[in-house]
Amino acid sequence: TNLNLASNKNRIVKLTNPLFIGGDSIRRVQPDGGGQTGSTLQIFKEGRPLGQFFTLKYAGKDANGVSQYYDKNNNLTTTPLNGVDYHYVGDAQPKLLLGWGNTFTYKKFDLSVFFRGVFGNKIFNATRADLSYVVTAGQTNISPYATDDKRTDARNNLFSSRYVEDGSYLRLKTVSLGYNVNSRLLNKVKIRSLRAY
Protein backbone atom coordinates (compact mmCIF):
# COMPACT_ATOMS: atom_id res chain seq x y z
CA THR A 1 0.00 0.00 0.00
CA ASN A 2 1.14 3.51 -0.87
CA LEU A 3 -0.70 6.43 0.70
CA ASN A 4 0.06 10.11 0.11
CA LEU A 5 -1.74 12.90 1.94
CA ALA A 6 -1.03 16.59 1.48
CA SER A 7 -2.44 19.81 2.80
CA ASN A 8 -1.13 23.09 1.45
CA LYS A 9 -1.54 26.56 2.87
CA ASN A 10 -0.63 29.77 1.10
CA ARG A 11 -0.99 33.50 1.60
CA ILE A 12 -0.41 36.39 -0.77
CA VAL A 13 2.16 38.64 0.87
CA LYS A 14 2.51 41.43 -1.69
CA LEU A 15 1.16 42.31 -5.12
CA THR A 16 3.93 43.97 -7.11
CA ASN A 17 2.59 44.26 -10.65
CA PRO A 18 2.90 47.96 -11.62
CA LEU A 19 -0.64 47.88 -13.04
CA PHE A 20 -2.02 47.41 -9.54
CA ILE A 21 0.09 49.87 -7.52
CA GLY A 22 -2.06 51.53 -4.90
CA GLY A 23 -4.46 48.62 -4.73
CA ASP A 24 -4.36 45.62 -2.46
CA SER A 25 -6.17 43.17 -4.72
CA ILE A 26 -6.61 41.89 -8.25
CA ARG A 27 -9.98 40.61 -9.47
CA ARG A 28 -9.58 37.54 -11.66
CA VAL A 29 -11.48 34.84 -13.50
CA GLN A 30 -13.99 36.41 -15.84
CA PRO A 31 -15.98 33.55 -17.32
CA ASP A 32 -18.09 34.28 -20.35
CA GLY A 33 -21.84 34.03 -20.24
CA GLY A 34 -25.02 35.91 -21.02
CA GLY A 35 -25.47 38.96 -18.81
CA GLN A 36 -22.09 38.54 -17.12
CA THR A 37 -20.17 41.59 -18.41
CA GLY A 38 -17.76 42.77 -15.74
CA SER A 39 -18.36 39.80 -13.45
CA THR A 40 -15.39 38.31 -11.64
CA LEU A 41 -15.23 35.20 -9.51
CA GLN A 42 -11.93 35.24 -7.66
CA ILE A 43 -9.69 37.75 -5.98
CA PHE A 44 -5.95 37.91 -5.33
CA LYS A 45 -5.69 39.98 -2.16
CA GLU A 46 -2.75 40.71 0.09
CA GLY A 47 -3.03 38.71 3.30
CA ARG A 48 -5.52 36.21 1.85
CA PRO A 49 -4.94 32.75 0.35
CA LEU A 50 -4.83 32.23 -3.41
CA GLY A 51 -8.01 30.92 -5.04
CA GLN A 52 -10.68 32.68 -2.96
CA PHE A 53 -14.11 32.92 -4.57
CA PHE A 54 -15.18 36.56 -4.22
CA THR A 55 -18.49 37.25 -5.91
CA LEU A 56 -22.18 37.91 -5.27
CA LYS A 57 -23.80 36.05 -2.37
CA TYR A 58 -27.11 34.44 -3.36
CA ALA A 59 -30.01 34.73 -0.88
CA GLY A 60 -32.80 32.75 -2.57
CA LYS A 61 -36.01 34.19 -4.04
CA ASP A 62 -38.20 37.01 -2.84
CA ALA A 63 -42.02 36.73 -2.58
CA ASN A 64 -42.33 37.38 -6.34
CA GLY A 65 -39.91 34.61 -7.28
CA VAL A 66 -37.09 37.01 -8.18
CA SER A 67 -33.50 36.15 -7.25
CA GLN A 68 -32.11 38.20 -4.41
CA TYR A 69 -28.59 38.74 -3.18
CA TYR A 70 -26.84 40.26 -0.20
CA ASP A 71 -25.36 43.68 -0.84
CA LYS A 72 -22.03 44.75 0.68
CA ASN A 73 -23.82 45.63 3.96
CA ASN A 74 -25.65 42.25 4.07
CA ASN A 75 -29.01 43.79 3.13
CA LEU A 76 -31.20 41.96 0.61
CA THR A 77 -31.39 43.32 -2.93
CA THR A 78 -32.67 42.11 -6.30
CA THR A 79 -30.32 44.51 -8.12
CA PRO A 80 -26.82 43.80 -6.82
CA LEU A 81 -23.89 45.87 -8.07
CA ASN A 82 -21.17 43.96 -9.92
CA GLY A 83 -17.83 44.32 -8.20
CA VAL A 84 -19.34 46.18 -5.23
CA ASP A 85 -21.71 43.77 -3.48
CA TYR A 86 -19.16 40.94 -3.36
CA HIS A 87 -18.47 38.50 -0.52
CA TYR A 88 -16.01 35.68 0.13
CA VAL A 89 -17.96 32.51 -0.70
CA GLY A 90 -15.41 29.68 -0.74
CA ASP A 91 -11.91 28.48 -1.48
CA ALA A 92 -10.87 26.73 -4.70
CA GLN A 93 -7.81 25.20 -2.99
CA PRO A 94 -8.42 21.73 -1.49
CA LYS A 95 -7.89 21.31 2.24
CA LEU A 96 -6.66 17.75 1.63
CA LEU A 97 -5.18 15.93 -1.38
CA LEU A 98 -5.03 12.14 -1.40
CA GLY A 99 -3.31 9.50 -3.48
CA TRP A 100 -3.71 5.81 -2.58
CA GLY A 101 -2.36 2.84 -4.47
CA ASN A 102 -2.50 -0.83 -3.60
CA THR A 103 -1.67 -4.18 -5.18
CA PHE A 104 -3.52 -7.35 -4.24
CA THR A 105 -2.13 -10.77 -5.19
CA TYR A 106 -3.70 -14.21 -5.28
CA LYS A 107 -1.73 -17.13 -6.65
CA LYS A 108 -0.64 -16.02 -10.17
CA PHE A 109 -3.06 -13.07 -10.32
CA ASP A 110 -2.49 -9.51 -9.18
CA LEU A 111 -4.76 -6.49 -9.10
CA SER A 112 -3.36 -2.95 -8.88
CA VAL A 113 -5.51 0.11 -8.16
CA PHE A 114 -4.82 3.80 -7.72
CA PHE A 115 -7.27 6.32 -6.26
CA ARG A 116 -6.92 10.10 -6.31
CA GLY A 117 -9.00 12.58 -4.35
CA VAL A 118 -9.32 16.16 -3.21
CA PHE A 119 -11.47 17.34 -0.33
CA GLY A 120 -12.67 20.65 1.10
CA ASN A 121 -12.51 22.78 -2.05
CA LYS A 122 -15.13 24.68 -4.02
CA ILE A 123 -15.69 24.87 -7.78
CA PHE A 124 -17.80 27.21 -9.88
CA ASN A 125 -20.39 25.56 -12.14
CA ALA A 126 -20.50 28.01 -15.07
CA THR A 127 -22.39 25.49 -17.21
CA ARG A 128 -25.27 25.40 -14.74
CA ALA A 129 -25.29 29.21 -14.56
CA ASP A 130 -25.39 29.56 -18.35
CA LEU A 131 -28.06 26.91 -18.88
CA SER A 132 -30.23 28.38 -16.09
CA TYR A 133 -30.44 31.80 -17.73
CA VAL A 134 -34.18 32.37 -18.26
CA VAL A 135 -33.61 35.16 -20.79
CA THR A 136 -32.09 32.69 -23.27
CA ALA A 137 -34.25 29.71 -22.26
CA GLY A 138 -35.56 27.98 -25.35
CA GLN A 139 -32.44 28.82 -27.39
CA THR A 140 -30.80 25.60 -26.25
CA ASN A 141 -32.04 22.04 -26.23
CA ILE A 142 -32.99 22.50 -22.57
CA SER A 143 -36.65 23.28 -22.05
CA PRO A 144 -37.40 26.61 -20.35
CA TYR A 145 -39.82 24.64 -18.18
CA ALA A 146 -36.96 22.56 -16.75
CA THR A 147 -35.71 25.44 -14.63
CA ASP A 148 -37.34 26.41 -11.35
CA ASP A 149 -36.90 30.11 -12.14
CA LYS A 150 -39.58 32.45 -13.46
CA ARG A 151 -39.15 33.84 -16.95
CA THR A 152 -39.26 37.34 -15.42
CA ASP A 153 -36.23 36.63 -13.18
CA ALA A 154 -33.63 38.14 -15.51
CA ARG A 155 -30.89 38.06 -12.84
CA ASN A 156 -31.29 34.39 -11.94
CA ASN A 157 -27.96 33.36 -13.42
CA LEU A 158 -25.70 36.11 -12.07
CA PHE A 159 -22.39 34.55 -11.13
CA SER A 160 -22.82 34.10 -7.41
CA SER A 161 -22.56 31.66 -4.53
CA ARG A 162 -25.62 29.93 -6.03
CA TYR A 163 -23.30 28.22 -8.50
CA VAL A 164 -20.34 27.64 -6.16
CA GLU A 165 -20.40 23.93 -5.36
CA ASP A 166 -18.45 21.33 -3.42
CA GLY A 167 -15.48 20.23 -5.53
CA SER A 168 -14.47 17.23 -3.41
CA TYR A 169 -14.07 13.90 -5.17
CA LEU A 170 -12.50 10.47 -4.89
CA ARG A 171 -11.80 8.77 -8.23
CA LEU A 172 -10.43 5.44 -9.31
CA LYS A 173 -7.71 6.61 -11.72
CA THR A 174 -6.13 3.31 -12.76
CA VAL A 175 -6.83 -0.38 -12.37
CA SER A 176 -4.92 -3.29 -13.87
CA LEU A 177 -5.37 -7.02 -13.58
CA GLY A 178 -2.39 -9.21 -14.39
CA TYR A 179 -1.58 -12.90 -14.66
CA ASN A 180 1.89 -14.48 -14.53
CA VAL A 181 2.05 -17.49 -16.85
CA ASN A 182 3.43 -20.66 -15.28
CA SER A 183 7.22 -20.81 -15.78
CA ARG A 184 7.17 -24.57 -16.46
CA LEU A 185 5.09 -23.97 -19.57
CA LEU A 186 7.40 -21.17 -20.69
CA ASN A 187 10.58 -23.24 -20.32
CA LYS A 188 9.39 -25.52 -23.11
CA VAL A 189 9.37 -22.60 -25.56
CA LYS A 190 12.49 -20.95 -24.07
CA ILE A 191 10.73 -17.92 -22.60
CA ARG A 192 11.91 -16.80 -19.17
CA SER A 193 8.69 -15.02 -18.06
CA LEU A 194 5.37 -13.92 -19.51
CA ARG A 195 2.80 -11.66 -17.95
CA ALA A 196 -0.67 -11.01 -19.35
CA TYR A 197 -2.73 -7.88 -18.53
Task: Give short role names for the model-derived ranges.
Residues T1-A92:
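Conserved small-residue
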Residues N2, G99-G101, T174-G178:
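Membrane-embedded beta-strand positions in outer-membrane beta-barrel channels/transporters
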Residues N4, L97, T103, L185-K190:
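Core subunits and conserved enzymes of cellular information-processing
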Residues L5-R11, Y106-K108, F115-N121, T174, ...:
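Transmembrane beta-strands of outer-membrane beta-barrel pores
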Residues D91-F124:
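Glycine-rich, aromatic-lined ligand/substrate-binding cores of catalytic
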Residues V118-Y197:
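Extracytoplasmic gating/loop element in the C-terminal half of outer-membrane beta-barrel translocons
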